[in-house]
Amino acid sequence: MSYSTRSISQSARFGVLASPGVNRARSVAGGASTVRMSSANVTSSAFGGSSAFAGSSAFAGSPAFNVSVTSNNGKETMQNLNDRLANYLDRVRSLEQANHELELKIREYLDKKAAVGSLDYSGYYNTINLLRSQINDATIDNTRLVLSIDNAKLAADDFKIKYESEMAIRTGAESDIVGLRRVLDELTLNKTDLELEIESLKEELIYLKKNHEEELAVVRSSARGNVDVQVDSAPPVDLAQIMADVRSQYESMMEKNRQELEACYKGQSENLNHEVATNTAALQTSKTAITDLKRTIQSLEIELQSLLSMKGALEGTLAETEAQYGAQLNHLQAMITQVEMELQNLRSDADHQSLEYKRLLDAKTRLEMEIATYRRLLEGEDTRFSQTETQKAVTIVSKEQSSSSIKKVKTVIEEVVDGKVVSSRVEELTETS
């Protein structure tokens, strides 16, 4: 909505003024009883055209007015308005051109982005899924190998405990064998002593036999002589019988000792042989178990080394794969960030251009409304001006017949909506001097 205001006052000036929304019409003043008036021809052009006033208006009486000054002011005002309109239109055209170029850039960018977004990444996705499945399989195998290693370690610990227990049993058996060997040595020494004692007894027996035979020989040789000696003495002692008794006693003692020694030796030997056989079997079993355990430990160590090497290779492959895809992901992330920044800049530029375009469009709309109002005022000014001048001339003549000076100011306010006059009212101000 815009308002145009026309004021008509009795002054010494005649001019045309224009402002946004408010337009002031010509003002006419007369100081004589006779008024002479000529119409003014107005030629106007909108949107970069030119406007000029042609015509003259003269008043007879005092004071006189120079209408050419008013005409020049109107021309300058219209020229300024036309220049401003031309500048606004040029700026609007340049901004429209820039907006069009920016829209083309945005469209090209969106087309390029759509073309990039429409690329087929199925091959990459398949490769990624394949690598993920391989990584999962390697992880499962690694976990399985870790479990196998743990089980092997537990089995090795069990075998180690068994080995230690068998070694303790073996050590006990060896210590028992050493003790039995000591007992055997003692028995051997006792046997040797007894054998030596038997030998000494045998030698003593031989010596006694020899002495007995010598004594018998002496007795027999003395008995062959014819010497008859009668001695009243105790009956003679039978030495042979005594020797035989002694021999039999010693032989019985020797036989008894020999039998006891043989029985003791046989019992201890049998016990020792039984213990040695038992311990030998246990030792052989322990040696066999130790050999099996060593073989098992060696095979498990070999398997552990192979699993550790496989684990290291898989970890290296996994690290290389993660590094490669991490680098690709970082590159893609950087590209996405750059594209987002470019898109944000384009959006900000587009928003700025849109705001500038709206501002200039509003200015253009207001200017077009002012031009339309100004054109409408110029087109309808002649008729209103002629009617108003006629009425004012009559009023002025009637007032000049009296001796007083009256100054009247009439203001015409028009309400314009979308280039159409909706309502109009007149305000009149009278001053008496």
From Swiss-Prot:
Region (Head): 1-73
SMART domains linked to this entry: Filament
Natural source organism: Xenopus laevis
A Pfam family per the record: Filament
Entry protein name: Keratin, type I cytoskeletal 47 kDa
Miscellaneous comment text of the record: There are two types of cytoskeletal and microfibrillar keratin: I (acidic; 40-55 kDa) and II (neutral to basic; 56-70 kDa).
Annotated spans, Linker 1: 110-127
Region (Coil 1B): 128-219
Keywords associated with the record: Coiled coil, Intermediate filament, Keratin
Annotated spans, Tail: 382-433
GO biological process: epithelial cell differentiation; intermediate filament organization
Region named Coil 1A: 74-109
Protein's UniProt keywords contain Coiled coil: yes
Signal peptide residues on this chain, from the entry's feature table: none
